[in-house]
Amino acid sequence: MKIFWPMKKLIVVLWVCSFATAFAQNHAINQQKLANIRQAEQSVVVLNNSGGYLPVKNMEGLKVANVHAGFDFAPVFDSIANKYSTVTSFNTDGITGTEAFNALHDKLKLYNLIVFTISGHTRFTPAFLAFVNDVAALHQVVFVLAGDGKNLTRLDKIQAPAIYYPNNTSEGASIAAQVIFGGVGATAKLAAGYSPGFKQGSGYTTTKIRLGYSVPEAVAVNSDRLAGIDSLIKAGIAAHAAPSVVVLLAKDGQVIFQKAYGKHTYDGTEVTQPDDIFDMASVTKVTATTPAIMRLYDQKAINIDSPISKYIALVRDAPDKRDVKIKEALLHEAGFTPYIKFYEQLKPTDMSRDSSAAYPTKVADGYYLRANYFNEVMWPVTLKSEGHTRGKFVYSDISMYMMKEVVEEVTHTKLNDFVNAEFYRPLGLQATGFLPRNRFDKIRIVPTTENDNWFRNMLVQGYVNDPGSAMAGGVEGHAGLFANANDLAIFYQMLLNQGVYGGKTYFNPGTVKTFTSRQSKVSHRGYGYDRRADKREPGDYCSEQAFGHSGYTGTYVWVDPQYNLVYIFLSNKTYPDDGKTFGVSKINLRPKVLDMYYKAIVDGRAVVEKK
């Protein structure tokens, strides 16, 4: 989020305080906050929405600017809006003359949604009113007005959606931002009339189409029951299970807990933030590669009962692989070897410290691999690799190397480009994707190892930790994806919704059920997705419907349709020494946090039933 404020430092402090309050772990405080939230939800009115623009449907290519004009809770509004789209904020405080407003107008030229936030005490000077009219004539505009409704009369002749709520509170600002993007639906009508365009009883009904953001009490979860998560994770960090952790909990379509712990490194100064970006490791399998296969299955572009060799010609020359079906690979029953140490094939001439046409593949800072290394070395080694007994469950990264090749052969598109176009951009995901250093400053990306002992022998930050994926250029079917917790919550809420999110259908419900249900006769697995194996993984309380996956770097995503929940756990357990640090796994930190989440839900249900 970019902020253009006269008092930027103060605003940032206020934003942090507002965020902390929104997710307070105190039942008494949150009960009062919930009462305020409910009041705001019941009073927010959507006006001038005959065209149905609200809630915003199309997130792809959306560039949002918030223009705050005397708005009292701008930091709260911005923090929530940024959950849905990257937002740049401007403030009109101190701007008075026409020339200054014209300069601000010029700064808005690259944005295609301008949100004006206005309070009842905002002064509509002639220069400001002219500015508002000029912007509304050239851009899609949404007005948000809090407090006294008299300023609605100033907007009477502007045909643009408006959101009004009478109580000028932080909760109202949060709800207004969520109404814009569909995290909350609106049903209220104006209690009084203000002008011919805003008559008493005016108001449009809008629907909830995306995740909302609230307190645990909003879904009958007692915040006090979640307080132990802090203790668990802080103890884990102290035991060097991982230096950096982010946990997100969502239930009933509401994110009710999102918190960051620790620092990027044990001895560093970079404090972990809730929106930090982590290496997904094997969570790539179920957030990129398997969904790509699901899309092709939906479109009948592939048949999972067909052999892989139908789609990949070179597999026809591999006797032990030519008859393997796609579904066998997805179930890890193809007989493939678990993994291949490709780095053991490296020769000094394969690597360079400088980039060139001969060495284009960047695997770390100052480390490049020669051109065509995957096609000339890695892929032939994969095809010739010895296997295991077909039909037996052997978890294998090679399965997803194969699935990536299937996707690219059928779509004629690179896997990273395909999932960006089909899922990540339409969903409004801001951080999810491969090759994050091409898009983000590395300070936003949590490092995975201080000294990669496999082959790079240096800090790995923003480059995929997995050696095979790194050597393949950072885009592979088993690893290479990076994401943050909020993005993952959106993606897995879409799956929990049976393939629907934001008013758009990404999968047929039957496809989601087919891939996430148990499909194996010899294991607990679905097609690509992991499922409950025992009480240790993913925890003691999850239902038989639950599905998800874990990642080697310390990542964890689980969805439980029976409890209507999403659980995201991100960490860098491989830091500082990949291959020797497995604390998160050894102390079962990820399942323990999930168990605490389930207990809080069950306790909440008991209280509701008792009442």
Which sequence ranges carry the predicted segments?
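Bacterial Sec-dependent N-terminal signal peptides
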Residues: 1-27
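Coil residues (strongly favoring Ser/Thr
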Residues: 12-13, 24, 79, 107, ...
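Preference for extracellular/luminal or secreted protein segments
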Residues: 24-222
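Short, gly/Ser/Thr-rich active-site loops of penicillin-recognizing serine hydrolases
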Residues: 27-28, 32-34, 54, 191-199, ...
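Short, conserved catalytic-motif segment at the N-terminal edge
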Residues: 218-280, 301-303, 537, 578-579
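Short active-site loop at a secondary-structure junction
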Residues: 239-246, 268-328, 386-399, 476-479
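Short, surface-exposed loop or secondary-structure junction motifs
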Residues: 319-545
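Short, surface-exposed beta-strand/loop micro-motifs that present aromatic residues
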Residues: 546, 553-568
